[in-house]
């Protein structure tokens, strides 16, 4: 027996659902949204209600502090069963696993039952999860949640005052994250929210419900921390769950945290991922997670079951050195258009920034592209469904699309990577740079391996099953033959045929695709 464990926000709070159904006018909701809300009376998992509105979700989910005290609470009953030995396998995300390890290291009540073996899939994401769990994040969603909580308790003036105070910050955080705006850009937008939160805390903090009071205290502490910018922490930005920006603070060295929590548990663990190593070298991952000198570690690399040499072609043309922005995007769009014609659409273009994606999107639209064009924005699920159901379509994407989406079959028969995905030079990288004697040493030990791992993740969008066929095009002049990162690119990817000739791209597609594929592309 197995169970999927999620965070509280994924489950229904019976008490909050009851209050929501009493307060809402169901006749004013669309049939699908109404049925989704009513269906929660019969199941606990919010993710099962496909058409549940985002607002309804926030109103009925289990709060961070659950104090309903109901013996019949479905969530509490579920947690009791999970804590028993009823399930032989429990599946959770990295954050819950780390939270459990932190609890155990501090002598607190564990969040997960005792286990005999841990299998950690997608383990390459562990360092980022640790940065969040061992640090602090501030998101737009947290600010909005507090405003709604104040309204729900009828403190309308406080809610409206806070909403006005955080408005500029929310607008800044709503911009798609691409790492170009440093943490310092956002700090001035926190001063007014800080004053307002302090005022609300003084005036009504003691009369709020326990849950809302805790939200207020936590937000006040977070905003204060980000305004102070303590020297013993690193402050940076990252992408939130909705594609916007969140503010982050973390400790400089995560390796000690790993050793004191997760690795101190004397039990067998299997860390698995398709992108843990570059070739057969796990050095970068072990260094980031504090396993570099751990004698218990054993390594294994399994060959891919996919026939890349037969089903994949790598196109890396020789391009001129990067020109001015306008000229560069003109040339890039021209190259992408030629590739789309050679492959008859069916393409995914993975960008490293939203600005580059927007520039190419604008130029492709001006050309009256012959293929349906989609851009992955905030409504990612809806857009990916449309793309999958539109034969011959072209999807422009960035961010989570590098590793978070699955497009099997002919849907992605052309994968275009305009720029090599080097890590963004943020405060985290600046701190890490201090550990190396020269910039070159830092580049070779950290920057290039991280680029290679991200490139492998992006490349993984091309071939998803043993019968998939795809052309992968890397349009970064630094990746071309005999250029600076040519050998690094080859070391990151499986052995596949390589060409600089666009005609060979077209010939490859003609040779591996059925007739119906070309009818789709022409539709």
Map each language-model feature to its residues.
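Conserved RecA-like ASCE P-loop NTPase motor core of nucleic-acid helicases/translocases
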Residues: 1, 270-274, 345-352, 356, ...
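A substrate-engagement module of RecA-like helicase motors
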Residues: 1-90, 95, 370, 430
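A contiguous, basic/glycine-rich beta-loop/short-helix subdomain that forms a polymer-engagement track
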Residues: 64-88, 101-109, 202-318, 324-328, ...
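Signature of the SF2 helicase/ATPase Hel1-core->accessory helical subdomain module
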Residues: 70-195, 274-289
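Conserved interdomain hinge at the start of the Helicase C-terminal
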Residues: 260, 317-352
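Conserved RecA-like P-loop NTPase helicase motor core
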Residues: 317-327, 379-480
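Conserved helicase motor "Helicase C" RecA-like lobe of SF1/SF2 P-loop NTPases
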Residues: 352-377
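N-terminal targeting/trafficking signals and adjacent low-complexity tails
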Residues: 473-523
């Amino acid at each position: 027996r197995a169970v999927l464990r999620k965070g509280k926000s994924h489950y229904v709070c019976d008490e909050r659902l009851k209050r929501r159904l009493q307060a809402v006018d169901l006749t004013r909701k669309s049939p699908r949204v109404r049925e989704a809300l009513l269906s929660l009376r019969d199941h606990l998992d919010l993710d099962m209600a496909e058409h549940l509105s985002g607002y309804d979700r926030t109103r009925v989910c289990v709060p961070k502090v659950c104090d309903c005290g109901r013996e019949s609470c479905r969530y509490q009953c579920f947690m009791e069963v999970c804590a028993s030995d009823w399930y032989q396998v429990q599946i959770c995300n990295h954050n819950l696993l780390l939270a459990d390890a932190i609890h155990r290291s501090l002598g607190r009540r564990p969040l997960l039952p005792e286990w005999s073996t841990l299998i950690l899939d997608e383990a390459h994401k562990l360092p980022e999860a640790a940065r969040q769990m061992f640090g602090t994040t501030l998101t737009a969603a947290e600010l909005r949640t507090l405003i709604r909580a104040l309204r729900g308790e009828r403190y309308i003036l406080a809610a409206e005052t806070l909403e006005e105070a955080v408005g500029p910050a929310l607008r800044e955080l709503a911009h798609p994250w691409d790492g170009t705006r440093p943490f310092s850009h956002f700090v001035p937008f926190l001063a007014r929210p800080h004053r307002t939160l302090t005022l609300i805390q003084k005036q009504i903090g003691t009369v709020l419900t326990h849950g809302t009071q805790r939200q207020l205290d936590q937000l006040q502490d977070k905003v204060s921390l980000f305004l102070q910018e303590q020297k013993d922490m690193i402050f940076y930005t990252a992408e939130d769950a909705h594609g916007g920006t969140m503010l982050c603070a973390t400790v400089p060295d995560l390796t000690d945290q790993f050793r004191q929590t997760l690795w101190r548990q004397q039990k067998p663990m299997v860390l698995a991922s398709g992108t843990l190593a570059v070739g057969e070298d796990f050095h970068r991952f072990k260094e980031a997670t504090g396993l570099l000198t751990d004698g218990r570690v054993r390594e294994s690399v399994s060959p891919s079951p996919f026939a890349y040499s037969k089903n994949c072609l790598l196109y890396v043309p020789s391009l001129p050195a990067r020109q001015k922005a306008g000229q560069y995007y003109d040339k890039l769009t021209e190259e992408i258009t030629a590739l789309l014609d050679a492959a008859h659409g069916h393409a995914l273009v993975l960008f490293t920034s939203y600005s580059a994606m927007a520039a190419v999107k604008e130029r492709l639209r001006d050309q009256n592209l012959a293929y349906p064009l989609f851009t992955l924005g905030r409504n990612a699920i809806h857009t990916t469904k449309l793309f999958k159901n539109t034969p011959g379509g072209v999807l422009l994407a960035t961010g989570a699309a590098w590793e978070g989406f699955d497009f099997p079959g002919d849907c992605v028969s052309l994968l275009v990577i305009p720029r090599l995905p080097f890590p963004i030079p943020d405060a985290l990288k600046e701190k890490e740079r201090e550990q190396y004697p020269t910039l070159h040493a830092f580049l070779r030990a950290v920057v290039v391996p991280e680029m290679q791992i991200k490139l492998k993740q992006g490349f993984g969008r091309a071939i998803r099953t043993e019968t998939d066929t795809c052309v992968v095009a890397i349009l970064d002049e630094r990746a071309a033959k005999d250029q600076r990162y040519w050998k690094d690119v080859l070391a990151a990817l499986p052995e596949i045929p390589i060409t600089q000739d666009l005609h060979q791209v077209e010939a490859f597609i003609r040779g591996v695709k059925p007739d119906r594929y070309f009818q789709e592309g022409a539709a």
